[in-house]
């Protein structure tokens, strides 16, 4: 358990107030929750549903610095995590994981969520492939070179472009599915 984790409510609340977790030390890292760093380097550590939840809640909190009320069941459905709010529900596990890794913290029925993420600690780098460890170090060097106020984690060396999701205006077609 992380020092940043506050005591969670006894049960997952039906609604909670979402607020940005303002932490100047982390905000200075300049890896927004919507960055490639979050999606690529944090994903194998936090897991896909937790990263998706972090990106969704972090973006929402960043856009609403005074806070916003979140319907937990709707959030779960929007993330593809089902309807349940029980102790063993997917949304409860996802929110617990966010808090366990210091990406969010409960304060009564309020959830403070990070809008930027810190660099992955060395102890977690062992879980990553050599390519992702290299990407992590490359992005940290780039962030350090940009200085405070720069936007790190969005643009990085071409040598790592194969690891990044590729955007395309072409619809993706898969057997048996409809292009969106």
Specify the residue positions occupied by each region the protein language model found.
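Electrostatic interaction modules used in gene-expression and signaling proteins
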Residues: 166-180
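Winged helix-turn-helix DNA-binding recognition segment
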Residues: 61-114
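Short recognition helix of helix-turn-helix/winged-helix DNA-binding domains
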Residues: 1-74
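Charged/polar, solvent-exposed surface patches and flexible loops
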Residues: 40, 44, 59, 74-77, ...
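Short, flexible loop/turn elements at secondary-structure junctions
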Residues: 50, 83, 117-121
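Short, charged low-complexity intrinsically disordered segments located at boundaries
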Residues: 67-72, 84-90, 122-130, 162-167
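Short, amphipathic alpha-helical interaction segments positioned at domain boundaries
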Residues: 118-162
């Amino acid at each position: 358990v992380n020092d940043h984790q506050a005591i969670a409510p006894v049960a997952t609340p039906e609604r909670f107030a979402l607020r940005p977790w303002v932490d100047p030390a982390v905000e200075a890292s300049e890896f927004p929750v919507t960055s490639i760093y979050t999606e690529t380097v944090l994903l194998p550590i936090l897991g896909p549903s937790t990263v998706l939840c972090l990106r969704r809640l972090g973006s929402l909190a960043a856009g609403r610095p005074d806070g916003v009320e979140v319907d937990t069941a709707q959030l779960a459905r929007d993330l593809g995590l089902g309807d349940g709010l029980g102790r063993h529900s997917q949304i409860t596990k996802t929110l617990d994981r966010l808090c366990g890794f210091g990406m969010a913290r409960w304060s009564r029925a309020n959830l403070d969520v990070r809008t930027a993420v810190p660099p992955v600690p060395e102890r977690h780098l062992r879980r990553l492939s050599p390519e992702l460890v290299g990407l992590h170090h490359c992005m940290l060097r780039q962030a350090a070179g940009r200085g405070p106020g720069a936007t790190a984690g969005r643009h990085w060396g071409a040598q790592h472009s194969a690891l990044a999701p590729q955007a395309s205006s072409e619809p993706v077609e898969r057997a048996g599915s409809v292009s969106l």
